[in-house]
Amino acid sequence: MNQINKFIKNLYLIIITIILIIVISNDNNGLFINGQSLPDGFCPQPLIYRNSTNRKADIDNGYNFVGETNCLLPCPSPLFPKSQWESYFEMSLIMGSISMFASLFLIITYSPLINKKHTRHTVGILCMSIGIFFVMVSDGRQLWDIESPGEYKKYCPDTGRYARQSDTKCLTTGLFFQFGCVTAIGWWSILAVDLWMTIAKKVQTTKKQLLYYLIGINTVSLILTFGPVVKNQYGFGNAAIGCWMLDLKYQYGFFWIPVGICLSVGSVFIGLIFWEIYKISDAVKKRYLKKHIKPLCLIVLMCLEFLYMFIYYSYITANQPTYNKHVAEYIMCLIINAANVPGSYTCQLKTVSPTAQFLFLIAIRLMGLQGLIFYGLTAATKKVWANSWIYKDLLKLFKLFTTKLYNDSSSEEVENSNYSNNNSNYYSSNGYTTGGSDNGVGSGRSDKFTKSSSNGGAQDNNNNNNNNNNNNNNNNNNNNNNNNNSSSLEISGVESNNSTPRVNSPDNLQP
């Protein structure tokens, strides 16, 4: 009976497959199948079945249905293997974190907090760094929101559901990313114009004109950022590692066309910069190149990165029908092999090159690090920090610390010296001298104690008494006793009538 049921099931799948092939062969425009459905509750892996009661609401919430079926594409999409997706997110975590801290350093360096002297050049660096910082804090994975490998709860909140604007984290990261990108490339083009004006020695920008730049670029950035919100355009897409605009027309209107304009302006002025350098003499040329080589390198590198992103995206968009066809073939392969044992067949999705996609994703995530190298590690940056109040206060604290440390060390040395002098004065004032042992080897203890009663000895004792006031009375008594005798007496276990007895026997030592 089981074999009969299995045969009927396989026959049913074969019939459905034949029908699907006929339908697809007559429909070249659809992503999958129009007006066709699979058996209820059945979806070949890795597709996910969903019993939808409100299909439109589910689509708006981020469920990506395959054609007219109840099958969902997994999240993240099968455009890339899971291992490739993981490498993309790990790259965003590492490079995004590095660029985030690098851009944060530039923001602090060129902010009014540290840099008191502002020019259009420093303001341009500051604003571009702010834009890059916004991009990095909204990247695929962040240091403060790291998920376990293989988990993408921020972008795939539920099984088979792609995050949408209604998800707070998705909307926040999407807004930050869009605002940061538009701001960064807008100020990049301003920096290209500024470098040309500096080298060509054109009219200097006034503070009023600089204020117009700030208001104009920020206003345009805010419009381009919040405009798509009206149409619920922010969400997690099939080939992204973060939330961004979903529909192609909004991507072009609110991002790629403005990017193309800024890219064109920047490229024109880069050409003018090289022309100005070409016209001047060799001696002056060397001086200008030495002075402006770092800003020029950064502007050219960012131009190449933005240009690659623009060309790559245009290529993907132009070949979208081809990729849709590949997706249809992939799903067809899954359906044909649905009756087979999982793992006994392989369905590969022919999509964009993983390497090209990796370069596309990493291009913008290098900009913070590049900004640090070409704008942060310069003599101008060193001068800004050297003149900052933070550096001066830290220098004062360091000097106070080292001075206190030196004074404490000197006080300790003085105390040790006084202690040694007091001990020496004590023994000298009592007329004791230490001698070596009989065998000539010093033992640290005296084998003989000698007391002098000569006038010279009295003078030495009197000199020592001047250094030790606490022993004056004892010294005077000793001196008087010494003066009453005309010769030295060596005490060897015998008391003298005119002197205090001293004993050299260990058994009879007195304190």
Swiss-Prot record:
Biased composition (Gly residues): 433-443
Main location: membrane
Similarity remark: Belongs to the G-protein coupled receptor Fz/Smo family.
Claim: Protein biosynthesis is one of the keywords in the record: no
Name of the protein described by the UniProt record: Frizzled/smoothened-like sans CRD protein C
Domain of life, per lineage: Eukaryota
Membrane topology reported for the UniProt record: Multi-pass membrane protein
Biased composition (Polar residues): 451-460, 486-511
Compartments (UniProt record): Membrane
Organism: Dictyostelium discoideum (Social amoeba)
This protein's UniProt keywords: Glycoprotein, Membrane, Receptor, Signal, Transmembrane, Transmembrane helix
Cytoplasmic compartment residues: 115-122, 194-209, 275-295, 379-511
Residue stretches of biased makeup (Low complexity): 461-485
